[in-house]
Amino acid sequence: MTKSLPGVADLRLGANHPRMWTRRVQGTVVNVGVKVLPWIPTPAKRILSAGRSVIIDGNTLDPTLQLMLSTSRIFGVDGLAVDDDIVASRAHMRAICEAMPGPQIHVDVTDLSIPGPAGEIPARHYRPSGGGATPLLVFYHGGGWTLGDLDTHDALCRLTCRDADIQVLSIDYRLAPEHPAPAAVEDAYAAFVWAHEHASDEFGALPGRVAVGGDSAGGNLSAVVCQLARDKARYEGGPTPVLQWLLYPRTDFTAQTRSMGLFGNGFLLTKRDIDWFHTQYLRDSDVDPADPRLSPLLAESLSGLAPALIAVAGFDPLRDEGESYAKALRAAGTAVDLRYLGSLTHGFLNLFQLGGGSAAGTNELISALRAHLSRV
């Protein structure tokens, strides 16, 4: 007779345990789990996931992600927002990223501050160890405009710098709810303009070869920066990015898509997370959800924008609006390279150290970024 582990049922959300103790157990599970996962053979991952593949909408979920998600749910971890608590949610995301296994990726790293519309903006610059002039990517981290920082995306920026052979400038823009919309947009645009002006003299990067990119909320900010830069260049003059690298971006705050219904629970980013992020970002803000500064898909014109390299994940509630943005850009005459990672979930780029599909997908997107920037 098969027995379940003693006490597992009691660890589910809703059990009568002190909240802090439950969070501590969840944190331990995350730390241990992510270190063990890369060493488990794929057939064993299937067995540990009850021997069943998850197939939705014609896509089969990556076995590594399937095991991670199923194990997390057993211990009450589902989604990024923790008990509607900003501090706990930020700590949760930071803990996941810090727990990732593997050696540190060695590139030259410098912390700095750059001028912004409301004061200095913390930033981190990454340079390939070989030196030499390269393109520069201005990177905006994900986290629902509410979570995340320079450290949560440090490993991804290091990997991008090394494997794309480019310089990366990661921007620690202001977060909600302390700084509601459009604070993040203002910081993101100011950072791009500053980076473009100082790419050569400050970093030794190739002048005029500055791209923008980011994951999730950072992809949203990248798309918005491209539109703002285009409009400024048309009417006032100013720099524009040479490429936009949009990684499972949020593009329409008003959307109620099919993928939102299919993947709104159980696939890392939940519908509840999305709603909570929107509440934080728009709290005390007078910006309408349909404003292009929030919803770049709803901009009056999508012509004249930088070429786009867009990634969508098959098990992501944001999948459909990412595809819709790619389609709309193409219809407006913008060059688009759309990469569909069917077996993956939202957030897989922060999980590349787990191996499996997350590593393969991340490598594909960084290789594509390198190829695109070599041609602009």
From Swiss-Prot:
Completely inhibited by tetrahydrolipstatin (THL), RHC-80267 and N-bromosuccinimide. Keywords: Cytoplasm, Hydrolase. It is found in: Cytoplasm. It catalyses: a carboxylic ester + H2O = an alcohol + a carboxylate + H(+); an acetyl ester + H2O = an aliphatic alcohol + acetate + H(+); a butanoate ester + H2O = an aliphatic alcohol + butanoate + H(+); an octanoate ester + H2O = an aliphatic alcohol + octanoate + H(+). Optimum pH is 8.0. Stable between pH 6.0-9.0 (with pNP-butyrate as substrate). Its EC number is 3.1.1.-. The keyword Ribonucleoprotein does not apply. Induction: Expressed in macrophages after 6 hours of infection. In vitro, expressed only in acidic stress conditions. Optimum temperature is 45 degrees Celsius (with pNP-butyrate as substrate). It is an enzyme of class 3 (hydrolase). InterPro entries: AB_hydrolase_3, AB_hydrolase_fold, GDXG_lipolytic_enzyme. The active site is at S216, D316, H346. Pfam families: Abhydrolase_3 (PF07859). One of its GO terms (molecular function) is acetylesterase activity. GO terms for cellular component: cytoplasm; plasma membrane. Its main location: cytoplasm. Belongs to the 'GDXG' lipolytic enzyme family. Non specific carboxylic ester hydrolase. Hydrolyzes various pNP-esters, with a preference for short carbon chain substrates. Can also hydrolyze tributyrin to di- and monobutyrin and 4-hydroxyphenylacetate to hydroquinone. This is Carboxylic ester hydrolase LipN. It comes from Mycobacterium tuberculosis (strain ATCC 25618 / H37Rv).
